[in-house]
Amino acid sequence: MLIWENNEDIRLIICANNRREIQKALNDCREERRPYVFVTPTMREILQINRILVPVTMLEEETYKAEICTYLARKTGAHLILLKAHDYGSHAQQNINRIKTHIESVSAKTGIPISYEIREAQKDSFSLYKEAVERQNDTAHQLLVLTASREYGLDDLLFGPPERQAIQRSQVPVMLVNPRADLFSLCD
């Protein structure tokens, strides 16, 4: 496993595509305040980021991704695809609305248009990360941005956390954001 920490803003983790190595890296990054990106040998080589897929579930911490995704879209000119979980409650929609408001406010403040679209997923919040990985050819994105698990429950210990499963199956780099209110801010 290689961890590149020369960048103050983002931590890059290059590791083998096996569950032990990925889980070790996930455990090492549990307290990380900045986003971290996983790259494995089975992922496609990415030369430019044009589209970023951002799955949004019912969990409140999903909104923490807004700042980072907006920053990346603004700096790379990438198009954001917000994939909303197909839930019966209104929490996923509220999170989408918060992220949308943040994107539009940053765009208005900076004068830089940020392109985004909202797509409805077929799966609920609990299966959304799996669907995001399955839709890689459909969305043609070059980066997948996920929220890391806040706590590991029994199912995470038995089957692995959803972010580890997404990293193992993904064909593109996966950026993780820890669910913390005091996240490292990306500044210009």
Regions found by a protein language model. Give the residues of each.
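Short beta->alpha junction loops
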Residues: 1, 116-125
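Short acidic/polar alpha-helix capping motifs at helix-coil junctions
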Residues: 32-35, 94-99, 126-130
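Short, well-ordered secondary-structure micro-motifs
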Residues: 65, 92-95, 127, 156-157, ...
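Intrinsically disordered or low-complexity boundary/linker segments at protein termini
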Residues: 2-67, 75, 83, 169-188
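Glycine- and other small-residue-rich loops at beta-strand/loop junctions that grip anionic moieties
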Residues: 58, 121, 155
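Small/aliphatic-rich secondary-structure junction motif
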Residues: 51-118, 137-142, 169-170, 174, ...
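Short beta-strand-loop elements within alpha/beta enzyme cores
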Residues: 2-30, 129-169
